[in-house]
Amino acid sequence: MQNPHAPAVHMNTRMFWTPHAWWFGGGFDLNPCIEYAADTAHFHATLETACAAHDPEYYPRFKAWADEYFFIPHRGRARGVGGIFYDDLNTGDWQADFAFTKAVGKTFLPAFLPLAEAHMDQDWNSCDKDAQLIHRGLYAEYNLVYDRGTKLDLTTGHDPEAVLMSLPPLAKW
């Protein structure tokens, strides 16, 4: 996003299948550099509704996990305004776990698109752009230092260009 008022978002889902086990996982978090309380409320309400349709305990459990997972200890703050994170999801009901993971994916547009549309044409200034570049630096710090997937992929021979493609093209500290 070029406009500093339009938030960045991260979302992924995954399924692992080995000869002896399977599980699902995913992460979905909002990373605005200029926070709007109404945007944060909409984002979390949309996620909560999607989670509750599958298990009323999912949203509080996975939100708490996201709050912990996306926290940057050396900064004493989260990289954004939260979301959900889950891993090792295997309730014993593959169909139900797959349905939940698909629902997380289908929640992306209703959770994020209204926020992007509301802010993408908003006026911004050099201070706003500076805030965006600093926040992008925060996002890069998190991904390079703490993200499990990034660390795993870089240490197991994956293509660094593919692994690092989610990093912002410009950042500032």
Report the location of each language-model feature:
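Internal mixed beta-strand/loop scaffold within catalytic domains of large alpha/beta enzymes
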Residues: 1-24
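Short loop/turn segments at secondary-structure transitions that flank enzyme active sites
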Residues: 5, 17-19, 34-36, 90-92, ...
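Long, contiguous binding/interaction regions
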Residues: 5-7, 110, 114, 150-173
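Aromatic/basic-lined ligand-recognition segments
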Residues: 13, 25, 66-92, 137-139, ...
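Mature, function-bearing regions of proteins
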Residues: 20, 31-37, 82-85, 90, ...
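Compact, glycine/acidic-enriched structural inserts
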Residues: 20-65
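A structural signal for the principal folded core domain
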Residues: 66-84, 97-105, 121, 161, ...
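Extended, compositionally biased non-globular segments
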Residues: 93-146, 151
